[in-house]
Curated annotation (Swiss-Prot):
InterPro entries: Metallo-B-lactamas, RibonucZ/Hydroxyglut_hydro, UPF0173, UPF0173_UPF0282_UlaG_hydrolase. GO terms for molecular function: hydrolase activity. SUPFAM superfamilies: Metallo-hydrolase/oxidoreductase (SSF56281). Pfam families: Lactamase_B_2. PANTHER family: UPF0173 METAL-DEPENDENT HYDROLASE MJ1163, UPF0173 METAL-DEPENDENT HYDROLASE MJ1163-RELATED. It comes from Nitratidesulfovibrio vulgaris (strain ATCC 29579 / DSM 644 / CCUG 34227 / NCIMB 8303 / VKM B-1760 / Hildenborough). Keywords: Hydrolase. This is UPF0173 metal-dependent hydrolase DVU_3308. It comes from the Bacteria. Belongs to the UPF0173 family.
Length: 239
């Protein structure tokens, strides 16, 4: 089975595998590096929002209303999104879910993790998603490094980690590289860099730090708008 990952820039990813399409942090309008419009992407079955900041909520409400996709978020952020126009029936689990909880949607299993950041509502979170074919990825959201990443790496065989490296508001390259080791991630795609001048502008330092802290973790360098296809039998994924 193959998994297709598309990076729309910043923390905005689509992951399609086993017939299910998951979109995370759909920041299109106002995203200076987004290569597509929100209404021109492949239809998602599920939209996940990591926290209530404009560059992560993005066009989640518009996309869900246009496609009927469910929206997954932490309890507390659901009310803010419904107030902003999201139909309540499109909220995954009716009211959202919470850290440590697992829900199912479109054949995928989604577990919510903690994140260390800020949010206008609810709390910031990350997600570990196991697709219908077993491919498992972790989207960290905006976060600093935290020691409990090691526990998530013991609980789940993470085929792919999507980690912020931009610094200032999140982990920097050194912290993100050590996070790969804690998570025991088989591969990593860096995110939350290059979007704005205040962030890390390339992945050079991350590549160097990864060689020091997690040399067995495979780095996939992507550019906004690029898609990557992983074959689990060739990549050595656990699933």
């Amino acid at each position: 089975m193959q998994t297709r990952i598309t990076w729309h820039g910043h923390s905005n990813f689509q992951v399609a595998s086993g017939g299910t399409n998951v979109l995370i942090d759909p920041f299109f309008d106002g995203n200076p590096v987004a290569a597509a419009r929100w209404d021109a992407i492949d239809r998602p079955d599920l939209v996940l929002v990591t926290h209530d900041h404009g560059d992560h909520v993005g066009q989640a409400i518009d996309i869900c209303k246009a496609t009927g996709a469910k929206l997954g978020c932490v309890v507390g952020t659901d009310a803010r999104l419904v107030e902003a126009g999201l139909p309540r029936e499109l909220v995954l689990n009716g009211i959202g879910f919470n850290i440590g909880g697992t829900v199912e949607c479109a054949g995928a299993r989604i577990t919510m993790t903690q994140a260390y950041h800020s949010s206008e509502s609810g709390v910031p979170v990350g997600y570990i998603v196991t697709m219908p074919d077993g491919f498992t990825f972790y989207h960290a959201g905006d976060t600093g490094i935290f020691s409990e990443m090691e526990l998530w790496g013991r609980l789940y065989a993470i085929d792919l980690a999507l980690l912020p490296i931009g610094g200032v508001f999140t982990m920097d390259p050194r912290q993100a590289a050590l996070a790969c080791s804690l998570l025991r991630a088989r591969s990593v795609i860096p995110m939350h860099w290059g979007t704005f001048p205040v962030l890390e502008q390339n992945t050079t330092r991350f590549r160097e730090q990864l060689a020091n802290h997690a040399p067995d973790c495979r780095l996939f360098n992507m550019t906004p708008g690029e898609s990557l296809t992983l074959d689990r039998s060739q990549e050595g994924c656990a699933c």
